[in-house]
Amino acid sequence: DCCIIAGCPFGCTICC
C-alpha cells in the first residue's frame, strides 16, 4: 500500500 511505498509506518491518511 501507499504507506509501505512511501516508507511510512503510520496510516495512509497520516502519511499519504
UniProtKB/Swiss-Prot annotation:
Localization of this protein: Secreted
GO-annotated cellular components: extracellular region
UniProt keyword Disulfide bond present: yes
Top-level taxonomic group: Eukaryota
Presence of keyword Lipid metabolism: no
Entry keyword set: Disulfide bond, Secreted, Toxin
Tissue specificity comment: Expressed by the venom duct.
Disulfide bonding pattern of the chain: 2-16, 3-12, 8-15
GO molecular function term, any single one: toxin activity
Signal peptide: none
Domain notes: The cysteine framework is III (CC-C-C-CC).
Family statement drawn from the similarity comment of this UniProt entry: Belongs to the conotoxin M superfamily.
Protein name according to UniProt: Conotoxin ar3e
Organism annotation: Conus araneosus (Cobweb cone)
